[in-house]
């Protein structure tokens, strides 16, 4: 122990007061204290130039190498060299002594010299074997927890793999169902198309047969009339005796002859274009439309939510801006459509007149003008409670078997198409504008019509729809 104590004292004598490790290139300053050259140089560079031990000032240029201390460090290292050889892993790399203590603060294995040094002497120490036992137990606990987490991770990996496989299977099954459903729907639509075409052809044949019969009867009457005309003409150019022969009977025949009423009014189609499931498909393109008060004619009254419009009894005192219609009871939707597919529905219940459709944002708003596709309006309308027309040039009469209470409007910008559907009649097609040359933004168009002495006071109301995933928000 005495030898160990002396070695400890010797190591302390060759320990730098700054880094607390054995001297490396030791130097002495004016006051006589020694330090590692690098350590004291860093102190001097910091502007202090004060001895860390006695606080006396010193100059870096006066540093003196301390060869005696350097030799002592080398001698101590040589003494420990033999002990280090062959047992390097269990020996202190600095002092060459056996590592048999554990510093709990620094978490390091120490030799007895390190433990007595100023760097560690105030730290709690335990025997290396005791520390190893304690940390062995802690490591076992940590290892058990990590293995439990590893098992959980492996279990999750298996579950993810199963879920991935199940999901792929589910998607493939759904793909097959979708494909089969659409194949079935396509086949059904083909069959329904053929059925409706056959009904239309049947209507065509029936009406042509009726018209043919009327034409034959008319031909018979025309022939009888021509024969009577010829007889009267012949009598007018014959002798007096021939003219007077049975003249009374002939005159009675001519006076009693009348063209029989054949009722040749235009036939109406009994079949309509009705595509099963069309409403559902159109509503996937549904958009939320609101009315733009800045475009509303001063006589129009908009609801608070801007989803309903009616003609008021008095003209409102509102600014006459450039966007506002001033001559007709018209209003535009607030939305601007530059592309995409868009669909909305309007309730026209109880109305005797209305106009619906789309128009260019740049259409004329002031004075009198014609609603037609030539002037940038793609609309249909009802007037006088029974006359439906499309705003072509000239107008196209529309024949509806079922008066609509709700009208669907579908805009396909890229296809240049605006279509109108009778929602009341299972979504049957009313009319389509096709191959339209759209330029610039389009806007929904509405007119509740004039009141017509109180007969057309019901409002136009935008119907609530579930906004579809394909409906564009490019407003």
UniProtKB/Swiss-Prot annotation:
EC number(s) stated in the UniProt entry for this protein: 2.3.2.27
Binding-site residues, Zn(2+): 92, 95, 114, 120
Reaction equations catalysed: S-ubiquitinyl-[E2 ubiquitin-conjugating enzyme]-L-cysteine + [acceptor protein]-L-lysine = [E2 ubiquitin-conjugating enzyme]-L-cysteine + N(6)-ubiquitinyl-[acceptor protein]-L-lysine
ZnF region ranges: B box-type: 92-123
Keyword Membrane applies: no
Zinc finger (RING-type): 16-55
Top-level EC class as recorded in UniProt: transferase
Domain B30.2/SPRY: 268-465
A biological-process GO annotation: protein K6-linked ubiquitination
CDD domains: Bbox2_TRIM21_C-IV, RING-HC_TRIM21_C-IV, SPRY_PRY_TRIM21
Inducing factors: Up-regulated by isoform 2 of XBP1. Up-regulated by IFNG/interferon-gamma, with a peak after 2-4 hours of treatment in monocytes/macrophages.
Record flagged with keyword Zinc: yes
Gene Ontology MF term list: DNA binding; identical protein binding; RNA binding; transcription coactivator activity; ubiquitin protein ligase activity; ubiquitin-protein transferase activity; zinc ion binding
Function: E3 ubiquitin-protein ligase whose activity is dependent on E2 enzymes, UBE2D1, UBE2D2, UBE2E1 and UBE2E2. Forms a ubiquitin ligase complex in cooperation with the E2 UBE2D2 that is used not only for the ubiquitination of USP4 and IKBKB but also for its self-ubiquitination. Component of cullin-RING-based SCF (SKP1-CUL1-F-box protein) E3 ubiquitin-protein ligase complexes such as SCF(SKP2)-like complexes. A TRIM21-containing SCF(SKP2)-like complex is shown to mediate ubiquitination of CDKN1B ('Thr-187' phosphorylated-form), thereby promoting its degradation by the proteasome.
Subunit comment: Homotrimer. Interacts (via C-terminus) with IRF8 (via C-terminus). Component of a SCF(SKP2)-like complex containing CUL1, SKP1, TRIM21 and SKP2. Interacts with CALR, CUL1, FBXW11, HSPA5, IKBKB, IRF3, SKP1 and VCP. Interacts with SKP2; the interaction with SKP2 does not depend on an intact F-box domain. Interacts (via N-terminus and C-terminus) with DCP2 (via N-terminus and C-terminus). Interacts with ULK1, BECN1 and with ATG8 family members, including GABARAP, GABARAPL1, GABARAPL2 and MAP1LC3C/LC3C. Interacts with TRIM21 and SQSTM1/sequestosome 1. Interacts with IRF3. (Microbial infection) Interacts (via B30.2/SPRY domain) with severe fever with thrombocytopenia syndrome virus (SFTSV) NSs; this interaction activates NFE2L2-mediated transcriptional activation of antioxidant genes.
PANTHER family found in the cross-reference section: E3 UBIQUITIN-PROTEIN LIGASE TRIM
Protein name: E3 ubiquitin-protein ligase TRIM21
Source organism phylogeny: Eukaryota, Metazoa, Chordata, Craniata, Vertebrata
Gene that this sequence comes from: TRIM21
């Amino acid at each position: 122990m005495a030898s160990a104590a002396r070695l400890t004292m010797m190591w302390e004598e060759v320990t730098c007061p700054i880094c607390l490790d054995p001297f490396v290139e030791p130097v002495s300053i004016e006051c006589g204290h020694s330090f590692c050259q690098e350590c004291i140089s860093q102190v001097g560079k910091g502007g202090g130039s004060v001895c860390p031990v006695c606080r006396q000032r010193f100059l870096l240029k006066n540093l003196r190498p301390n060869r005696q201390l350097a030799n002592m460090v080398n001698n101590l290292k040589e003494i420990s060299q033999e002990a280090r050889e062959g047992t390097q892993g269990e020996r202190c790399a600095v002092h060459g002594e056996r590592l048999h203590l554990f510093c709990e603060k620094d978490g390091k294995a120490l030799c007895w010299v390190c433990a007595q040094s100023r760097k560690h002497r105030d730290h709690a120490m335990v025997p290396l074997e005791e520390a190893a036992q304690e940390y062995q137990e802690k490591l076992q606990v940590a290892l058990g927890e990590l293995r439990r987490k590893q098992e959980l991770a492996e279990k999750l990996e298996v579950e993810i793999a199963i879920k991935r496989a199940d999901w792929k299977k589910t998607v493939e099954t759904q793909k097959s169902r979708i494909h089969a459903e659409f194949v079935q729907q396509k086949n059904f639509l083909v069959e329904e198309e053929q059925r409706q075409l056959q009904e239309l052809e049947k209507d065509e044949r029936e009406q042509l047969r009726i018209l043919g019969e009327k034409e034959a009867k008319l031909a018979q009457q025309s022939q009888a009339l021509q024969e009577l005309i010829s007889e009267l003409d012949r009598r007018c150019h014959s002798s007096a005796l021939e003219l007077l022969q049975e003249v009374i009977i002939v005159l009675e025949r001519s006076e009693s002859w009348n063209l029989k009423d054949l009722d040749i009014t235009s036939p109406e189609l009994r079949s309509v274009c009705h595509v099963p499931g069309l409403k559902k498909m159109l509503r996937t393109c549904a958009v939320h439309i609101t009315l733009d008060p800045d475009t509303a004619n001063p006589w129009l009254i908009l609801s608070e939510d801007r989803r309903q419009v009616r003609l008021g009894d008095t003209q409102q005192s509102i600014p006459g801006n450039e966007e506002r219609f001033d001559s007709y009871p018209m209003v535009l939707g607030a939305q601007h459509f530059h592309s995409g597919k868009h669909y909305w529905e309007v309730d026209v219940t109880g109305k005797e007149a209305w106009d619906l459709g789309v128009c260019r944002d740049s259409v004329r708003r002031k004075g009198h003008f014609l609603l037609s596709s030539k002037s940038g309006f793609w609309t249909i309308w009802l007037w006088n409670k029974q006359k439906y027309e499309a705003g072509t040039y000239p107008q196209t009469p529309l024949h509806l078997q079922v008066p609509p209470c709700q009208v669907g409007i579908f805009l396909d910008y890229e296809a240049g198409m605006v279509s109108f559907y009778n929602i009341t009649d299972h979504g049957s097609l009313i009319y389509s504008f096709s191959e339209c040359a759209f330029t610039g933004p389009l806007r929904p168009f509405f007119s509740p019509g004039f009141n017509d002495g109180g007969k057309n006071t019901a409002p136009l109301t935008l119907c609530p729809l579930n906004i579809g995933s394909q409906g564009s928000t490019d407003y």
